């Protein structure tokens, strides 16, 4: 009896201490908490690794693995779909077992392993390396975003600005990795230094180096996070957790680690054969939705309405990413086949590097500015609500794809068109993305109960998985059926597809803005 009482007293003191520590973190002064900067740099280097490899995939598959263009588009969509689908699984294990910190660290180790395998022999071990990266990203990505959300109280108006800054960190990494990795692989960067037969090895090896920097950054700054991200088996702020309850639970953590390694051969097989991806995507979505509905039964009607609103955002984000992610598929091949290498008439650059990096550069420039604009508008009570912001994102995307389509009118007889207009389209894409993606990360944390935040963040990225999957299908449909088609014929095929996407994006934006009053009611007090 006395032992239990002492244990309860110790638990109460621990909870009180953790609550005070969290309160201190959330009551920061200024625009951003210092912990945001630590997570910013860790995420920046991880995104260098991720986007560096993402930018190489389609080009590498066509020119090094000698896949057909439509096959490479489908393969790209399948690979990226698995990457984002596993963010849901990673969020689930983080919520229930590992906690955000351990999940992030384990994911980082797996990503480093995958990059090193690809650096050793990217042609022979392509799918093995990609499989490690798929699983690693699933454990890493949703959890660092959730920890950013935990730095803020639910009603803190600075949250959107914080996520916008964090998003610019993502894009600094994407800019550097997106341009550097593929340019090294193609020999456009350090071509005179790196031997031709080792260029792709070095490109993938660079991804491993920067991922290691990301992990080291997190390890040396994680203490500043206080109770944020601790395992739910140990976190004193988790309801029902006591010292007695956590005893003997370590096997669950070890089982998670071992299980994630055991599924590598399964993932390798499924990623290599896109028909398996089809079945996976047919199953994972309905199963995830059923699981969420089950979890929703545990909450009040008010919380259920908020989660329903979150699902509306998730559905429309699938459509958005299906269009946006042409950047890694059809637009990558369009850049390789149909763009000149002159920017602003004088600068000679790699068109694929521009395709991978232009959007990120524009986000770096405009994300902080847009965050400040949202704050300025909020203070004057003229800020558009979150649903309208989403709708505006689609309208910008529609305009961008019309510009991609319009590049056909600047092409020469050989089918080579203007890199300047292509880059202009990415500027417009950026405004669309900034209306949706950083706000989307923020709204998931605002609409979700604490116990479901990891799962809902995972669902947000699962929506990206379906978007990536659809992007591969859309990109494959744009490819000319004649593999020996000229550059001019490929130009017509791709730009016809971009015109269709422009129309679809316009319709989606108008519909979303039209239903915004209904969605706002579901969101309750959340803005």
Regions found by a protein language model. Give the residues of each.
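Hydrophobic core of transmembrane alpha-helices in multi-pass small-molecule transporters
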Residues: 44, 114, 125-140, 314, ...
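Short amphipathic helix-loop junctions that connect adjacent transmembrane helices
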Residues: 53-73, 186, 327-353
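Glycine-rich segments within core transmembrane alpha-helices of 12-TM secondary carriers
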Residues: 83, 158-186, 203-214, 258-261, ...
